[in-house]
Amino acid sequence: MSAAQPLDHVLRHNTWATVTLLEFCAALDPVTLEMSAVGTYGTLHGTLQHLVGAEQWYLQLLTGDLLGRPRIRRTDSHPLTELAMTASLTGARVLEVVATDDVTRRIEMNEGRRSTVGVILAQLVHHGNEHRAQATTILGANGIEPPPVSGWGYGRATGISEAEE
C-alpha cells in the first residue's frame, strides 16, 4: 500500500469493513440472512443492502455517477456478492473524490437541501459504521461470531498494524 492521507485510511477501512462483512455473510444460509435483532435496522440482508445502496447515493451526490446498476433499493433483493462488488467500486471512487474534490464544495441534494462534500463524506463513514454495527449485533444476538471489522482488524488485514482489539 502506498503512502496515503489520513482520510484515505478511514475511507479504505469503511470499504474493507463492508466488503469483509458482506463476504462473511455470503457464506451464511438464507435463513440466517433473514434474522434480525431488537434495535437494528431490519434483517441482516436488508441492513447490508441498505448500507450499500446508501453509499451508492452518497457517491451519486458527490459525482453524479451511479456505480452498480440499478441503484440498490430496499424493495429489491440483491445477492451479497453483487453488494460486495458495488461496495468495492463505490469505495474506490470515493477515494478518487477525496483526492481531487474540495471538501467545502456545496452540493444540491434533494428538496432544495444543500450540503458540503466534507459533510457527505462524514455521513458516509458514520452511516457505514452504524449499520455494520447493527449487522454484527444481529449476528452476535443469533449466536454467530462476526468477523473483526474494526479499525484494528483493518490494520491487521492490510498488514499496516499489529494492534489487537
Show which residues each predicted segment covers.
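Active-site rim elements
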Residues: 4-10, 80-81
